[in-house]
Amino acid sequence: MESERIRTELLLEKAIKITSFLILEYANIDNSQWSMGGGTILMLNYHHRLSKDVDIFVSNTQYFNGLSPKLNDVAEDADFYQEGERFISLSYPEGKIDFVKAFQVSDYLPTLKHVFNQNIFVDDDIEIVTKKVFFRGASLHPRDLYDLATVYLGPRRSELVNALINIPEQLQEFHDALQRVGPGFSFSEDYGLDLVLDIPLGLKGREVDICIDLCNEVRKSLV
């Protein structure tokens, strides 16, 4: 598992250098107008699972199309890519880089940090998991549930609850989806090697129940 973590961090270092070069040199998007978030940042902060993908959230979308392999000489080296209205996804043997048109969904702003030998803006943990509920909570991605449960059981529980209070419609969709699978359900078999098993939280197999508890706590605050 340790060798897997080292390999992951090395490929992510390569990936962030690629994305930085793409953004700064080709798309002309200033580094103050994009941030790194998603499971990779949570992995670095909580060490709760492995994450091999890089998520770059672009707030200034004026030059977003410049990240496309159709227009970007560096991006065209990707083995495979997908484009949608709000995203450009580049796949490499080492992992995937997702560029996403996104806006801030909480009051927790990105901060400048030294990550993978780069000074970049990094999304706050609360913003990361709130985005997961806002943009795709109803889809019940197993990794999202595990991330949410991890943050909820951590020291920033009240901050997460307060952030979700401000997105009641998306929270309701998330809650309804959880109710459809029901208490006691687990996605644990879907994780494979994505989990780091030596953490003391003991949440593997309980992630759905923990997220239901989270929703119930937020809903009580809305009454």
Locate each region found by the language model:
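Compositionally biased terminal segments of proteins
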Residues: 1-223
